[in-house]
Amino acid sequence: MRFIEEFINKGYFHQCTDLDRLTAITKETKIAAYIGFDCTATSLHIGSLMQIMILRLLQQHGHKPIVIIGGGTSKIGDPTWKDEVRKILSKEDIAKNAEGIKKSLSKFIKFGDGKSDAIMLDNAEWLDSFNYLDFLRDFGSYFSVNRMLTMDSVKLRLEREQHLSFLEFNYMLLQAYDFYYLSKHYNCSLQLGGSDQWGNIVMGADLIRKISGKEVFGMTTPLLTTSSGAKMGKTAAGAVWLNEDLLSPYDYYQYWRNCEDADIVRFAKLYSEFTQEELNRFESLAAEDINAAKKQLAYELTKLCHSEQAAKSALETAVKIFEEGQIDENLPTVVLEQEVLQAGISAYELFHEAGLATSKSEARKLIRGNGAKINDRLVEDENMIINTNFLLDKKVIKLSAGKKKHILVRV
């Protein structure tokens, strides 16, 4: 199966500047294509997983993935579909975040000097040295403000009478220049991104055409939500991070294990490397087979992101907890100061401190709704004092929020 054919078959396709021509070119030759990532955290989360899998698909078909870390543009902020102005990051934060993002990406793609090896660039390398007057002189005349004002991302802010600073308005010019720079210096002929980036991508392609006459393309992916409308990558407990220092492989496994029934087939297509035969089997699941399919999906996605050993450990932990009722040492763990437990802490405060509730009021609500357990026993009094007497084997306390969220408290 060719790159574009598989791209469409997996559900990645939304829009392309010239799909027929891009299909023909990628059949005849290998290209370089790039995707940009915000440099706003020390890890990517599953909201970026489709873009990462596209980079992986490019590499598998012999094309060269280029990853752009927005070290330069992160100093400004992308107004695209954002209701508020973004916080501007320091150089130190950007460098730290870039290191973590490369760690996320290295789980899925190979970086190096080979023809199809990925490279990662920070657009600060060329944007930081910009002279503003030179930029206006050399590139300003190629951009139409009339057209920029018609872009949905800008129009949305203006219609709501929300603040759109000149700083942010310049973001789309810089992203367009990124594409031009990569086309000129790395022979990059394709920019990929979410459908919310369409206007910025087209501006870059137009800039290249006007200056150099090169044939380049833009292609976007659909913006994904779960079947219930929730944003991919976010849960009530926070983001589903790819790096294990922010989210354990067990919690990563549990996220996919607990996905909605209606999402199984779509997630399998988007995020796994199951064969077509396996995908066909997912599409014809009987009701009694859904749980087994979720386990298989969670196992495969955890193996892809972390390792087969991590996937095995996550599966074994889940079996011990949910099927055998045991306590497993691989459960996520939080450490509580011994003095706190010796003095005693109320049940609702403990659930909040352990991260099983985002606020103390939410912890109270969890307990009042009979959703909280300590050492597998229902917590009936939110003010019950928890102390060292609750330690199992003098080591841990097991907290459970609902049937699927468990954590160990150690001192």
From Swiss-Prot:
<feature type="domain" description="S4 RNA-binding">
    <location>
        <begin position="345"/>
        <end position="411"/>
    </location>
</feature>
<feature type="binding site">
    <location>
        <position position="234"/>
    </location>
    <ligand>
        <name>ATP</name>
    </ligand>
</feature>
<feature type="short sequence motif" description="'KMSKS' region">
    <location>
        <begin position="231"/>
        <end position="235"/>
    </location>
</feature>
<dbReference type="InterPro" id="IPR036986">
    <property type="entry name" value="S4_RNA-bd_sf"/>
</dbReference>
<keyword id="KW-0436">Ligase</keyword>
<dbReference type="GO" id="GO:0005829">
    <property type="term" value="C:cytosol"/>
</dbReference>
<keyword id="KW-0547">Nucleotide-binding</keyword>
<dbReference type="Pfam" id="PF22421">
    <property type="entry name" value="SYY_C-terminal"/>
</dbReference>
<keyword id="KW-0030">Aminoacyl-tRNA synthetase</keyword>
<dbReference type="InterPro" id="IPR002305">
    <property type="entry name" value="aa-tRNA-synth_Ic"/>
</dbReference>
<keyword id="KW-0067">ATP-binding</keyword>
<dbReference type="InterPro" id="IPR002307">
    <property type="entry name" value="Tyr-tRNA-ligase"/>
</dbReference>
<dbReference type="GO" id="GO:0004831">
    <property type="term" value="F:tyrosine-tRNA ligase activity"/>
</dbReference>
<keyword id="KW-0963">Cytoplasm</keyword>
<comment type="subunit">
    <text>Homodimer.</text>
</comment>
<dbReference type="Pfam" id="PF00579">
    <property type="entry name" value="tRNA-synt_1b"/>
</dbReference>
<feature type="binding site">
    <location>
        <position position="34"/>
    </location>
    <ligand>
        <name>L-tyrosine</name>
    </ligand>
</feature>
<dbReference type="InterPro" id="IPR054608">
    <property type="entry name" value="SYY-like_C"/>
</dbReference>
<feature type="short sequence motif" description="'HIGH' region">
    <location>
        <begin position="39"/>
        <end position="48"/>
    </location>
</feature>
<dbReference type="InterPro" id="IPR024107">
    <property type="entry name" value="Tyr-tRNA-ligase_bac_1"/>
</dbReference>
<dbReference type="GO" id="GO:0003723">
    <property type="term" value="F:RNA binding"/>
</dbReference>
<comment type="similarity">
    <text>Belongs to the class-I aminoacyl-tRNA synthetase family. TyrS type 1 subfamily.</text>
</comment>
<dbReference type="GO" id="GO:0005524">
    <property type="term" value="F:ATP binding"/>
</dbReference>
<dbReference type="GO" id="GO:0006437">
    <property type="term" value="P:tyrosyl-tRNA aminoacylation"/>
</dbReference>
<keyword id="KW-0648">Protein biosynthesis</keyword>
<dbReference type="InterPro" id="IPR014729">
    <property type="entry name" value="Rossmann-like_a/b/a_fold"/>
</dbReference>
<comment type="function">
    <text>Catalyzes the attachment of tyrosine to tRNA(Tyr) in a two-step reaction: tyrosine is first activated by ATP to form Tyr-AMP and then transferred to the acceptor end of tRNA(Tyr).</text>
</comment>
<protein>
    <recommendedName>
        <fullName>Tyrosine--tRNA ligase</fullName>
        <ecNumber>6.1.1.1</ecNumber>
    </recommendedName>
</protein>
<keyword id="KW-0694">RNA-binding</keyword>
<feature type="binding site">
    <location>
        <position position="175"/>
    </location>
    <ligand>
        <name>L-tyrosine</name>
    </ligand>
</feature>
<feature type="binding site">
    <location>
        <position position="171"/>
    </location>
    <ligand>
        <name>L-tyrosine</name>
    </ligand>
</feature>
<dbReference type="InterPro" id="IPR024088">
    <property type="entry name" value="Tyr-tRNA-ligase_bac-type"/>
</dbReference>
